[in-house]
């Protein structure tokens, strides 16, 4: 009887040690992109246009992007009104828009267009909401880049009624990160984000001293931290507006440089 009890103790100890060893050998937990961002309901609004026929005058703006043509957004972009901009939280969101109910303004047979929010259409309190103050709150308005507008509407129309909805952002390649500033004040630009497209949270971790550190939104999609990040391989964790997370492990090498864009291998769906 004693032998049976002792043998049981030995077996349990062995099982415990094996489990402990397996736990030590297990890889670190990775935040994965579970599921996909799904399109939202159709809503009604109006659209105007700004910039030149080649997209000039629309390549930067209130979201902090420096050149949308090089950051994964092209010229299929839109400056949205304050309710959609959300103090920068709406930057990077993708919308499907189509011209409706304007036989003289809509382009016949035009397919719906997908654009990315990259700028703010500021309010014009000196004009009424239905006569020049198109972007005055609480209006949800789309000031499209001229190349985008001309795909669905006639230039002479100036303003057209549209139907729109949020859709998944389909991007080529992984999420991109660009750090500017100096060792004691880092501004991190996050771009080329798929899925929901917008960024609601960002954290960084180094491979040496820097533990997981949340960044604060500076403006648009520029995120700031005073943590000294130089000399370490950096991992970023992005949370989009639908609360999905993706971790870009060691996307910046230990000798990363300010002003250089680094691209992860993965993105949101």
UniProtKB/Swiss-Prot annotation:
SUPFAM superfamilies: Barwin-like endoglucanases, PHL pollen allergen. Residues 1-25 form the signal peptide. One of its GO terms (biological process) is plant-type cell wall loosening. GO terms for cellular component: extracellular region; membrane. InterPro entries: Expan_Lol_pI, Expansin, Expansin/allergen_DPBB_dom, Expansin_CBD, Expansin_CBD_sf, RlpA-like_DPBB, RlpA-like_sf. It is a peripheral membrane protein. The keyword Cell wall biogenesis/degradation applies. Residues 60-174 form the Expansin-like EG45 domain. The keyword GTP-binding does not apply. Keywords: Cell wall, Cell wall biogenesis/degradation, Membrane, Secreted, Signal. Gene3D superfamilies: Expansin, cellulose-binding-like domain, RlpA-like domain. It is found in: Secreted, Cell wall; Membrane. Residues 184-264 form the Expansin-like CBD domain. PANTHER family: EXPANSIN-A15 (PTHR31867). Belongs to the expansin family. Expansin A subfamily. May cause loosening and extension of plant cell walls by disrupting non-covalent bonding between cellulose microfibrils and matrix glucans. No enzymatic activity has been found. May be required for rapid internodal elongation in deepwater rice during submergence. This is Expansin-A32. It comes from Oryza sativa subsp. japonica (Rice).
